C-alpha cells in the first residue's frame, strides 16, 4: 500500500499540474480537470516531437564566489523541452563530466552548435522523456565546462551551485541566455527530479539534503552519501592527495584559476591523520537526512569497488529513520548503471517513478516491496526492506588452527594468531589456498553449510589485539568458498559488464543525438570462491574517527572492523571463510608500519547479519579446501586515484 506521505504528494502534483494546464481557461463547474495532453492510460506517452524540441542554453546566477575573484559564480545549464504551451516538470542531471570525461558506458559528451546552444546530450533521458512531457536539464557543475567558479568536491560550492538551478526553475533566481537576455522558466511546473550516477548521483544526495523546495525526487545511482566514507576507510586513506587531484581532474577553468582552491582541499582532507574533521563533515549528507523533502530511488552495486556499498546503506537507514518515501535497487555488479544491467526493467521503473513523483499519476509505483535485489547473476528477487526483515546479528567465535587455517563456529573461541605486516600481500594470496600457513594473514573456515544461508546487512569483525608499533591498518575479508557462477565485478574498470555488438533504442533520435545504445551483459565466471565483503580500519582510530590515538606497543586493545554491506545467498555445502591481515595496498594507501600483531581469539568474534537459519555448527578442525582462481578473472592493481 502506498504510504500517506506518497499519496498526498502525488495528489498535490496532480492538482498543480491540472491548474497550470488550465490557466486562462474557463472550466465547467462540474467537469473534472482533464489530464495534460501527454497523459493517456495512466502514464505519460510520446506526444511531442523530439526533433522539434526547444533547445536552449542559459547561465544561472549564484550567490557563490568559489574562485574568489570578486564576481558571483554562474552555472551553465542546457535544456531540452517539449515545444508546447503546457508547463512540464524537469528531470535534471548535474555533472562535472560533461566536457572532460563523458557519461554512461559510451563516455558521451555534450555537443553544441556554432552558436553555443546544446545540440546533443549524453544518455537517453532527453530522448525518452521529452516526447512524454518532461524537460531534461543538464547542469555543468561549478568550475567545470562552461560554468565559472571552482569545484570543492562535494562541498558547499558544488551543492550550492546545483541548488541555485533548482531555485531558478522555481522562480527564486535569475538567469541569462548567452546573448544576455533574461531567461525565465515559465515553461515548467517547477517540480524537479534529479538523477545521475556516481558523482552526479552524489550531487542529487547533497542537494536533497539541503531541503530545497521544488526538488520532488532524486535517483542516485552508485552515489556517495559521505565523502569520508568514499575517500577514507575508518581512518585509512584510499589514496593520498585525493581531494585536490579530483577537483583538478574535472577543472574546466583557465590554467591556474583554481590551483589555490585545489591545494586547500588536499590540505584540509588531512592525509596525515585520516581523521574525520570539519572538512569531511561538510561533505557528509547523512546527518541532514531529516531535511530531505524529496522521495528517493537508490540504485547501487553491492560489489561496487569504486563507491563502496556503505554509501547507500547509511543513507538508506537515515532516510528510513525520517520516513522519507524510498525504494532501492541492489545488484551484484560493480560501479554500473542499472541501464547496463537490466535495461528494460530499469527504464520501466524510471518511467513509473517520474510519472508518479513529477506528474502526479497514481500508478502504484510506491506499492509492494521496497527493494529489488540481485543475489546471483540475473537472479532478481523482491524484498520488503533492506536489510531483509528478520535479519539479526549472529555472533560466531574464532579458534586457532594447528599452523594453518583456524575455525569459525558457534562454540567458544580459543588460541592466538600472530600477523606480520606485508604491504606486498595481494588479495589472491590472502584468500587463495586458505589452509596454507602464512605469517602475513590468518584464515578461519566454517563447516560446510547445512542449508542455504541468507546474509543481509553489514558484517563486523571484533578483534582483541596488541601491536609492536603505534599504528597499523587492520583488514578483514569475508569469503564464500565453493564453486559457483559469480559476477566478475572487477572486470572492465570495476564495472562487471562487457559490451555486445547490438544496440537497443530508448526514445527518439535525431541526426545529432542517437537514442540507441550498446547492449551489455554481465561478466560471469565459474569460480571456486568469491570475496563477499571487505573491511578496513586504522588501529589509531579504534575509539572514534575524529581523533588519531596511537596504540601503546604491547598493550591489548579491542577494535571492530566494519565490512561493506551485502545481500547474498550462500549455498548449502559451501564454507564460510574469514581472512584477517594488516596492510592492503591493493585497496588502500596506508602508511605501512611493518607491525607485528597478535590477536587473542578467545575475545574475538565475527558477527554475521543473517536472515533465517545460520546453518553453521561447531567445528574442531578446519576443513581442507582446494581452490583455484581462474586466470580469466580480473585482478587488482595498486590503488590509483580514480573518478567517482
Describe each model-derived feature in a short phrase.
Residues 145-166, 173, 338-346:
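Catalytic nucleophile-loop/oxyanion-hole region of alpha/beta-hydrolase
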Residues 292, 298-300, 304:
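Short beta-strand/loop motif that positions the catalytic acidic residue
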Residues 35-44, 343-644:
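C-terminal, loop-rich substrate-recognition/catalytic regions characterized by aromatic stacking residues
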Residues 305-311:
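Conserved alpha/beta-hydrolase "acid-adjacent" motif
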Residues 30-108, 112-115, 122-125, 135, ...:
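Catalytic-loop region of hydrolases
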Residues 2-32:
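Secretory targeting and sorting signals
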Residues 130-146:
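Conserved alpha/beta-hydrolase
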Amino acid at each position: 500500500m502506498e504510504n500517506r506521505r506518497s499519496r498526498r504528494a502525488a495528489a498535490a502534483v496532480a492538482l498543480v499540474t491540472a491548474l497550470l494546464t488550465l490557466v486562462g481557461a474557463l472550466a465547467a463547474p462540474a467537469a473534472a480537470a482533464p489530464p495534460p495532453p501527454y497523459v493517456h492510460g495512466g502514464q505519460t506517452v510520446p506526444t511531442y516531437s523530439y526533433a522539434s524540441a526547444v533547445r536552449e542554453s542559459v547561465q544561472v546566477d549564484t550567490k557563490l564566489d568559489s574562485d574568489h575573484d570578486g564576481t558571483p559564480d554562474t552555472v551553465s545549464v542546457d535544456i531540452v523541452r517539449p515545444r508546447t504551451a503546457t508547463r512540464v516538470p524537469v528531470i535534471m542531471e548535474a555533472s562535472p563530466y560533461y566536457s572532460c570525461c563523458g557519461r554512461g558506458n559510451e563516455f558521451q559528451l555534450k555537443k553544441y552548435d556554432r552558436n553555443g546552444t546544446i545540440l546533443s546530450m549524453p544518455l537517453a533521458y532527453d530522448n525518452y522523456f521529452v516526447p512524454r512531457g518532461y524537460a531534461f536539464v543538464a547542469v555543468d557543475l561549478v568550475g567545470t565546462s562552461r560554468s565559472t567558479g571552482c569545484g570543492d568536491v562535494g562541498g558547499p560550492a558544488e551543492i550550492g551551485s546545483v541548488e541555485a538551478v533548482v531555485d531558478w526553475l522555481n522562480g527564486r533566481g535569475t538567469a541569462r541566455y548567452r546573448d544576455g537576455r533574461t531567461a525565465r522558466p515559465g515553461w515548467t511546473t517547477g517540480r524537479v527530479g534529479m538523477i545521475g550516477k556516481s558523482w552526479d548521483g552524489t550531487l542529487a544526495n547533497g542537494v536533497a539534503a539541503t531541503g530545497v523546495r521544488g526538488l520532488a525526487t532524486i535517483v542516485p545511482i552508485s552515489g556517495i552519501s559521505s565523502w569520508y566514507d568514499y575517500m577514507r576507510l575508518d581512518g585509512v586513506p584510499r589514496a593520498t592527495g585525493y581531494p585536490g587531484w579530483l577537483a583538478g581532474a574535472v577543472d574546466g577553468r583557465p590554467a591556474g584559476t583554481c590551483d589555490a582552491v585545489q591545494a586547500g582541499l588536499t590540505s584540509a582532507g588531512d592525509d596525515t591523520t585520516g581523521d574525520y574533521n570539519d572538512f569531511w563533515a561538510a561533505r557528509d549528507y547523512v546527518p541532514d537526512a531529516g531535511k530531505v523533502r524529496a522521495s528517493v530511488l537508490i540504485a547501487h552495486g553491492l560489489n561496487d569497488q569504486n563507491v563502496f556499498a556503505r554509501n547507500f546503506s547509511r543513507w538508506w537507514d537515515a532516510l528510513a529513520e525520517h520516513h522519507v518515501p524510498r525504494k532501492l535497487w541492489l545488484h551484484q555488479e560493480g560501479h554500473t548503471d542499472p541501464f547496463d544491467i537490466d535495461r528494460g526493467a530499469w527504464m520501466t521503473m524510471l518511467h513509473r517513478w517520474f510519472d508518479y513523483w513529477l506528474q502526479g499519476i497514481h500508478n502504484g509505483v510506491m506499492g509492494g516491496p521496497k527493494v529489488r535485489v540481485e543475489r546471483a547473476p540475473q537472479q532478481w528477487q523482491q524484498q520488503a526492506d533492506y536489510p531483509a526483515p528478520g535479519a539479526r546479528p549472529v555472533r560466531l567465535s574464532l579458534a586457532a588452527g594447528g599452523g594453518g587455517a583456524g575455525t569459525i563456529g558457534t562454540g567458544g573461541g580459543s588460541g592466538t594468531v600472530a600477523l606480520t605486516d606485508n604491504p606486498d600481500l595481494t588479495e589472491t594470496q590472502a584468500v587463495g589456498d586458505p589452509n596454507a600457513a602464512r605469517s602475513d594473514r590468518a584464515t578461519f573456515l566454517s563447516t560446510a553449510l547445512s542449508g542455504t544461508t541468507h546474509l543481509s546487512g553489514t558484517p563486523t569483525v571484533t578483534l582483541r589485539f596488541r601491536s609492536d608499533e603505534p599504528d597499523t591498518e587492520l583488514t578483514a575479508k569475508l569469503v564464500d568458498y565453493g564453486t559457483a557462477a559469480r559476477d566478475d565485478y572487477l572486470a572492465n574498470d570495476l564495472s562487471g559488464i562487457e559490451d555486445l555488438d547490438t544496440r537497443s533504442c530508448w526514445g527518439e533520435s535525431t541526426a545529432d543525438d542517437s537514442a540507441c545504445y550498446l547492449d551489455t551483459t554481465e561478466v560471469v565466471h565459474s569460480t571456486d570462491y568469491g570475496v563477499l565483503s571487505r573491511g578496513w580500519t586504522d588501529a589509531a582510530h579504534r575509539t572514534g574517527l575524529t581523533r588519531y590515538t596511537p596504540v601503546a606497543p604491547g598493550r591489548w586493545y579491542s577494535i571492530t572492523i566494519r565490512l561493506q554491506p551485502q545481500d547474498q545467498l550462500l549455498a548449502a555445502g559451501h564454507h564460510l571463510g574469514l581472512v584477517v591481515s594488516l596492510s592492503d595496498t591493493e585497496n588502500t594507501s596506508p602508511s605501512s608500519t611493518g607491525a607485528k600483531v597478535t590477536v587473542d581469539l578467545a575475545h574475538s568474534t565475527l558477527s554475521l547479519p543473517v536472515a533465517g537459519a545460520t546453518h553453521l555448527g561447531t567445528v574442531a578442525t578446519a576443513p581442507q579446501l582446494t581452490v583455484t582462481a581462474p586466470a580469466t578473472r580480473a585482478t587488482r592493481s595498486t590503488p590509483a586515484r580514480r573518478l567517482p
